[in-house]
Structure formats: C-alpha cells, structure tokens
C-alpha cells in the first residue's frame, strides 16, 4: 500500500501505521531541549516514544528532561544516559539501539518539529519500499521563515537532481529510518573518532550501499536553529568541508555533490549578518513553520 492509498477500513489502516520513535541526542542543550520536547509531545499523532539521550552534559539538560517527565506523565518521554564516549555518533547509536519503534525518527535537540511530523513520517513509511526519509527545515531564529523554508526545500530537491537520484541524503535534524534498515547498516556505519565527517551523510551512503531507498518528503518539516552561523569562519569552514571528507571516506567522486559546500560557503557572511540584526530586533518565541 502506498502512502497515498487507504484500504477504506480505518481499523486496518491504523493497524498498518508504523510506530514512530523519536530519538534526540543531547549534550549541554539546556537552552533548547524543552522547546524540542514540547514540539515532539504536541503532535497530531503521538509518537511511540520520545527518547532523549544525554551525553555527559554538565548543564541542566537532564534535569529539564526529568522535570518534563513529571509535567507530562502521559507522554512517553524517556531519558537515557550515554556516558561511555563523548560524541554525537555513539550517542545517536545508543538511542537508535534502544528505540523500540518500527520507524526510528532522529532529530537534534534544537529541532522543533511541525505538529504533524509524526503523522507525515507514518504516511511516508506506509510505502514499504521506503527505508529512510528526510524533509526540509525552517530556521526559526532567522527572518523570512516562509522564504527560507521554500529555499531549503528547493535546494534539497536540486541536490537530488544533481546526484541523478543516485544518492538521497538524510539530514540529521529531520530524518527517520526503519528499525530493520538501521539493523542492516548498524555495524558498518563509520565511528568517525576524529570527528571529521557528516554523520547523516555517512548513514545515507551506507543505506545506498545496500540499495535501501531514502525518500525525500517535502511535508515532513522540522524547525531548527541557525546557531551554526555563530561559528567562527575557521570553524564554519571545517564544518562545511565535512562533506568532502565524508565523500572521500566512501570513495564518492561525483563533482555535483560539492554543490552544498558552495551554497554554504556563499551564504555564511550575509546570513550571519542577517541573523545578528534579526536577533537584536526581535525577542519572539520559537514559531513553527514558515511563518
């Protein structure tokens, strides 16, 4: 049954919908974790579980999650601790390994998913050929959010065309994959102990090696912070060139895939200035969507 088809029997359709776990790796995220969890809680269709994996945080991240467990006892918020290794990849892996859903959503601690995010993920995975999915993001702490969402969507669709649909890249702030797909690639994913690569691109390339289909879903929208623009030019350059290092690790030489690097480099200074002006002139709470 495709994502657009229905059996006509509401009970059967509900039974076929996959259970969606939401996994959120977190390190010193006290400033954003509450808004992230509130967005994950208030969904048109509830998540099977919402897992925060605390990775040796030294701030109040874990305390805030525990407080929210008390405030929202009906919500399936789970707090796990990954204190063996510092880093996103071991923390991500720990969360995905412990998730019990049919589909494993993965977002960042600064993500603010749209109210129908879980529902859109379920719809996408009703197509049994889909093994992973990703969607566009809107930068909620930037001006012109509606334009930004459209631009992000267009850029990601352009990437698909440039890659001639050979590679469909996941975006770590807004992605999901089947538990079976994760189990297939789990042992092969790069540990990246030097922290040189984009872990979401690495996941995507391992999925491609097994011919596991990644679907781009424009309706699967998440907000995220543009806080990356706070990086120094040197740190930002290192972040952007992670694309190259990830491609090299997988012996991917398609020149068209360098397009995101060009885009990210070209927007850094104007976007950084725009965000600084916007931050000074506004004190609005986080809003969902391109509003």
Where are these regions (language model features)?
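A conserved acidic beta->alpha catalytic loop
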Residues: 39, 54-63, 84, 111
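Glycine-rich, basic loop-to-helix element that forms the pyrophosphate-binding segment
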Residues: 82-99
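Cell-envelope/extracellular polymer assembly enzymes that use nucleotide-activated donors
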Residues: 19-21, 49, 202
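Acidic donor-binding loop at a coil-to-helix junction in glycosyltransferase catalytic cores
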Residues: 193-203
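Conserved donor NDP-sugar-binding/catalytic core segment of glycosyltransferases
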Residues: 116-146
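Short, well-formed alpha-helical segments that are part of the catalytic scaffolds
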Residues: 8, 29-42
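Short aromatic/hydrophobic "clamp" motif used to bind/position activated sugar donors
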Residues: 104
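Short, flexible, basic/aromatic active-site loop/helix in glycosyltransferases
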Residues: 135-139, 147-168
